[in-house]
């Protein structure tokens, strides 16, 4: 595997395909460019997903995220693009991507995008006493 930025996402087989479980990934150093000003925008990405057959490989995710450093994109567009690419690579039961962008001009932006597989029924939440 290269150490250059790349839009190629690698995956591996889910080691527990018969169980619903959540994978949580935090990416604190996401950067893209504002398409209006060309200035860098910084964000922390929070990825939560319930895998089906495939899981995303973490080094390829890091290189994928790096590939946005010189790309101009609005926050809403880039968040949904990343979610779409991750869904295409892994076909999860459920995936949520939260992008918390750093302040720009006194405004904080958080974009939350979700995907739910049409055949998946989430488990009933457990309420502890």
Curated annotation (Swiss-Prot):
Pathway given for this chain reads: tRNA modification; tRNA-queuosine biosynthesis
User: What Gene Ontology cellular-component terms does the record carry?
Assistant: cytoplasm
Keywords attached to this entry: Cytoplasm, NADP, Oxidoreductase, Queuosine biosynthesis
Compartments (UniProt record): Cytoplasm
Q: Which reaction does this enzyme catalyse, per its entry?
A: 7-aminomethyl-7-carbaguanine + 2 NADP(+) = 7-cyano-7-deazaguanine + 2 NADPH + 3 H(+)
Q: Which catalytic residues are annotated?
A: 34, 41
- What's the top EC group for this one? oxidoreductase
Task: Please state the Enzyme Commission number of this protein.
Answer: 1.7.1.13
Transmembrane portions of the chain: none
Tell me a GO biological process for this protein: tRNA modification
Binding-site residues for substrate, renumbered to this chain:
56-58, 75-76
Q: Name one Pfam family in it.
A: QueF
Predominant place of localization: cytoplasm
- Gene Ontology MF term list: preQ1 synthase activity
Q: Which PANTHER family match?
A: NADPH-DEPENDENT 7-CYANO-7-DEAZAGUANINE REDUCTASE
What protein family does this chain belong to? Answer: Belongs to the GTP cyclohydrolase I family. QueF type 1 subfamily.
Recorded hits in NCBIfam families, A to Z, give: QueF-II (TIGR03139)
- Job description of the protein: Catalyzes the NADPH-dependent reduction of 7-cyano-7-deazaguanine (preQ0) to 7-aminomethyl-7-deazaguanine (preQ1).
Record protein name field: NADPH-dependent 7-cyano-7-deazaguanine reductase
């Amino acid at each position: 595997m290269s150490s250059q930025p790349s839009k190629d996402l690698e995956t591996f087989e889910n080691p527990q395909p018969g169980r619903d479980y959540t994978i949580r990934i935090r990416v604190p150093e996401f950067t893209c460019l504002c398409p209006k000003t060309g200035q860098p925008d910084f964000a922390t990405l929070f990825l939560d997903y319930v895998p089906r057959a495939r899981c995303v490989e973490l080094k390829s995710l890091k290189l994928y995220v790096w590939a946005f450093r010189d790309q101009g994109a609005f926050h809403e567009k880039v968040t949904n693009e990343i979610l779409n690419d991750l869904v295409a690579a892994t076909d999860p039961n459920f995936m949520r991507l939260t992008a918390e962008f750093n302040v720009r001009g006194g405004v904080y932006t958080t974009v939350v995008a979700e995907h739910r597989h049409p055949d998946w029924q989430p488990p009933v939440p457990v309420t502890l006493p």
